[in-house]
């Protein structure tokens, strides 16, 4: 408690905490907001991290920070800011500059996504409409409420937008810094609260065992050489009785997806999914299938699999 009070008591650190409670920010973004320049910002961030009030998240050549999500740190910050006047002039100016930084982030995301839009649209045209698939996902998961939802390979953050309103906490991971930029911008623009993203590998996610109620793996497995490892990680982090939802293509023969779009596997066979799930203590149901658009010769069937973690899961795949 004393260390936390000492760390939060410095004015610049208090401003940093106020900003990070609103959204995750890189060091560069914090510098843009905290005018004039704060040469001791790295020292402040180190002290806040050591006190358990912020979390450090490396992301390629970037480092992002967020307000603590741990039970002690979060409770301390909630209590601290409940006593502060958010209309205090300096905090209000910071909030206004944060909006400007967020607008710049959105422009960066739009520029990146415009470069891949043609590819994205071409793939979308090959399969069943996304809105209907998303409706089926929510139906299969149930309306919650969920304690914690995790999205493996979050991409644009669409699954977080869909499920965050049904959860106390929702978090997505992705290897791509560019896609995380897109996801952050989308979540901010859509006003999605309680959802965060961070860089991570779906085969070694930064979450504790038995900590999630729902894990989603949406159109990720066909990019992997060992999809079973992502399924094993999902089982590890799921609570007993927790659900895993997987969306991916049924087996197909569209070789151009491998050559031009980096698909490692041409769809996922239910038989393989069943084996991988059983190996890590997941009870897998038959998939719900969505055929390609009528008249689409080179269309793709999309499957949604639902699995539930057994009360006594088997050992995980190494």
What residue spans do the PLM features occupy?
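A short glycine-rich, Lys/Arg-flanked "PGG" loop and its adjoining helix->strand segment in the class I
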Residues: 228-243
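A short SAM/SAH-binding and catalytic strip from SAM-dependent methyltransferases
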Residues: 213-226
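N-terminal helix-turn-helix DNA-binding core of bacterial DNA-binding proteins
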Residues: 2-40, 62-71, 136-138
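Conserved alpha-helix/loop element of class I SAM-dependent methyltransferases that forms part
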Residues: 127-147
């Amino acid at each position: 408690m004393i260390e936390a009070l000492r760390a939060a008591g410095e004015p610049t650190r208090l401003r940093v905490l106020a900003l990070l409670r609103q959204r995750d920010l890189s060091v560069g973004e914090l510098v843009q907001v905290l005018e004039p320049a704060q040469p001791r910002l790295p020292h402040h961030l180190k002290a806040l991290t050591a006190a358990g009030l912020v979390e450090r998240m490396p992301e390629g050549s970037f480092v992002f920070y967020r307000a603590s999500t741990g039970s002690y740190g979060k409770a301390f910050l909630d209590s601290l800011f409940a006593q502060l006047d958010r209309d205090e002039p300096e905090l209000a100016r910071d909030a206004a500059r944060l909006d400007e930084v967020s607008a710049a982030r959105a422009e960066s995301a739009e520029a990146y996504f415009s470069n891949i839009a043609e590819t994205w649209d071409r793939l979308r045209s090959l399969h069943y409409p996304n809105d209907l698939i998303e409706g089926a996902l929510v139906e299969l998961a149930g309306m919650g409420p969920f304690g914690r939802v995790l999205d493996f390979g979050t991409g644009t953050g669409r699954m977080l937008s869909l499920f965050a309103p049904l959860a106390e906490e929702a978090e997505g991971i992705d290897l791509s810094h560019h896609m995380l930029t897109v996801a952050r911008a989308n979540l901010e623009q859509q006003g999605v609260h309680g959802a965060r993203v961070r860089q991570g590998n779906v085969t070694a996610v930064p979450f504790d065992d038995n900590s999630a109620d729902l894990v989603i793996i949406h159109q990720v497995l066909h990019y992997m050489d060992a999809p079973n490892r992502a399924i094993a990680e999902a089982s590890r982090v799921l609570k007993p009785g927790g659900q895993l939802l997987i969306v991916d293509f049924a087996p197909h023969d569209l070789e151009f997806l491998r050559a031009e779009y980096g698909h490692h596997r041409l769809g996922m066979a239910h038989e393989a999914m069943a084996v991988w799930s059983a190996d890590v203590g997941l009870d897998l149901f038959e998939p719900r299938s969505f055929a390609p658009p009528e008249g689409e010769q080179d269309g793709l069937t999309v499957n949604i699999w639902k699995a539930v973690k057994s009360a006594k899961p088997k050992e995980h795949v190494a």
